[in-house]
Every structure is written in C-alpha cells, then in structure tokens.
Amino acid sequence: MKTYAQKASEVQRDWYVIDATNQTLGRLATQIATLLRGKHKPTFSPYIDGGDFVIVVNAERIRLTGRKPEQKMYYRHSNYPGGFKAVSFKQLIARHPERVLRFAVKGMLPKTRLGRRQLAKLKIYAGPKHPHAAQQPKVYEPRPRG
C-alpha cells in the first residue's frame, strides 16, 4: 500500500465559529492553531496549507488566570532610538481585544510563508457578530480542560 500525500488542490476547507467567552487565552489559542494548521485531519501534511477557516467571536471576553491580566506585557520596538513600547494585557484588551488572541495564535504557527497564510484564515471579532454567515460555519466547542 502506498503512502498518501495530500496535494494542495485536494484540500477540503471547513469554516468553524468559536465563542471565546470565558475561555482561557492559551488553551483556546492552541486549539485554534491546530484547526488552522489542519492537524485535526487524517490528511495532515506539514508542508501543505490544509487547515480550516476559524471565526472567533466575543474576543473581548477572553480571560487569563491568576494575576496575569495586570502583569502580562506585550512589547514592540519601532527601530528608532527610544522607540521601545510596552503595553499590559488589560490595556490591550480594552483598546484592541482581537490582537491579544492573534498574538497568541501567531506564536504557535510556523514563522514562514506557510504560517502567514494559515494566520490569514483566522477571523477575530470583539463582539458576538461576524459577517461570515454565507460560509455557513459550524459551531466548534473547545475541548474541556482535563
């Protein structure tokens, strides 16, 4: 029996919608990264973009455990002298709630062109509404802890 190797033209993509209300950031991000990469499919191939589209709603209601909402920091630099910026999780979730989840998922995907293509299939919305009803997304229930 020959080993099956999936081709890019044979990929079947589904659309999933995930409600982030009261979900822990890291645990939800790992499940989203798995869906985006296609690792949940028996036809997974690390060099083919075989993942599904993921829509996340209620990103503003995502949570962290412990004291991390006050202590977790996000850093960036403008490459100019004195251009170092730091913002806490609490400040970032207040201004741009979708960026928190995008940063977490981005760190779990490959740092290549393939990873950027997979991240483009992630659609995050702060509130409960999304404009992707025409794609008929399936409701994805994140795995329970334990």
UniProtKB/Swiss-Prot annotation:
Keyword annotations of the record: Ribonucleoprotein, Ribosomal protein
A Pfam family recorded for this sequence: Ribosomal_L13
Gene Ontology BP term (one): translation
One Gene Ontology cellular component: cytosolic large ribosomal subunit
GO MF terms held by the record: mRNA binding; structural constituent of ribosome
Family: Belongs to the universal ribosomal protein uL13 family.
Self-association state and partner proteins as the record states: Part of the 50S ribosomal subunit.
Record-given protein name: Large ribosomal subunit protein uL13
Originating organism: Roseiflexus castenholzii (strain DSM 13941 / HLO8)
